[in-house]
């Protein structure tokens, strides 16, 4: 079982500390929710845990190894992340965007195998977006784009998925479906 550990982690931007001395251990097979008021550092913590933002102190470890010691490709096989930032690849088709989650597993040229393409379609199916596979990302609603980004994380097939507001932009029935899917995937 993969675990992610925060060891005396201090997060923030440049020299502006948001939270210090964080300690936590999360195991695979668990669904953990981080709650807090707006502006309290939840997204900063997720960005730091993913390696997108360097810690101001301490470490984030996966399976006992600091994420700083992983190559980008090796880390992408351990952890995927869905953030709340707007998607800037409006001209890609949905299946092309989700296929980006498979690139840690592709060859030097980034070619997808038929197995990769199957995983992309299965991931889209899990979030109810398979019928949208050929649509341009720029034509999707905010909720549809959120589902596509979650499908991309699922296609990455990592033991750890970090989700920043995973039900943002989703209508109420889709929120319920997404939470059921996440619970199922965690167990």
Region spans (language model):
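Conserved structural motif at the start of ABC-family nucleotide-binding domains
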Residues: 4-6, 19-21
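Conserved ABC ATPase signature
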Residues: 111, 136-140, 144
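The feature captures the beta-strand-to-loop junction immediately N-terminal to the Walker
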Residues: 35-37
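Catalytic Walker B motif of ABC-type/P-loop ATPase nucleotide-binding domains
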Residues: 161-165, 170
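Helix-to-loop junction immediately C-terminal to a conserved catalytic motif
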Residues: 50
């Amino acid at each position: 079982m993969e675990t992610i550990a925060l060891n005396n982690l201090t997060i923030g931007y440049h020299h502006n500390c948001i939270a210090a001395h964080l300690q936590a251990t999360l195991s695979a097979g668990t669904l953990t929710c981080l709650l807090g008021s707006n502006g309290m550092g939840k997204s900063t913590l997720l960005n730091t845990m993913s390696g997108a933002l360097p810690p101001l102190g301490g470490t984030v470890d996966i399976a006992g190894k600091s994420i700083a010691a992983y190559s980008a490709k090796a880390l992408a096989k351990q952890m995927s992340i869905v953030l709340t930032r707007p998607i800037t690849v409006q001209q890609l088709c949905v299946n092309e965007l989700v296929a980006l989650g498979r690139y840690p597993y592709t060859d030097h040229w980034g070619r997808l195998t038929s197995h990769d393409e199957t995983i992309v379609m299965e991931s889209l199916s899990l979030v109810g977006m398979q019928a949208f596979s050929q649509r341009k990302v720029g034509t999707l609603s905010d909720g549809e784009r959120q589902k596509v980004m979650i499908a991309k994380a699922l296609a990455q097939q990592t033991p750890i998925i970090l989700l920043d507001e995973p039900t943002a932009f989703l209508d109420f029935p889709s929120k319920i479906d997404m939470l059921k899917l996440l619970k199922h995937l965690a167990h």
